[in-house]
């Protein structure tokens, strides 16, 4: 998941995300099976995407902000997503996800700092994945769990909210907004000129 992100995204977007997808832990992704537009990570994040995000601790205090640039590509049957983060304190970080989608909407995946296998599922305009991550904290690391939700909106923006826990106790919330780097068609999150790989992935 920089101060000037507020000038790029409407101030109310993250508030809307918090209101719309609060209480994620009680939701099931199947509840959104009939919602449009359809969100498939390997379709939406194919090519270039930019995101703006922030992390609040359990007391509601803003701890960190970031901008992330992402590039997604199909490598055989796997979807590889490279994320380059720039945090408001100047720190930079790269994470590379490898996701294996299946026809029933289930996903399995890995990343360098993720513990074990990522488990995810998509339905309708929603995608939920759960994973454990070794998170840098000061000079050490914390092993934390993410319950991560994404929702594709009709204007092509994806709203993201993840609850972060340690030893089963919530320690904070990550909220982010993602937007494609090319214009959308009909506000459905699809680029004006669809690359061949994107068209094939959507079929």
Enumerate the predicted regions with their spans.
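A short, Trp-centered hydrophobic/proline-enriched beta-strand micro-motif
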Residues: 45-53, 160
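Central antiparallel beta-sheet cores of small beta-barrel/beta-sandwich binding domains
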Residues: 52, 56-137
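Glycine-rich, aromatic-bearing surface loops/beta-hairpins
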Residues: 147, 151-203
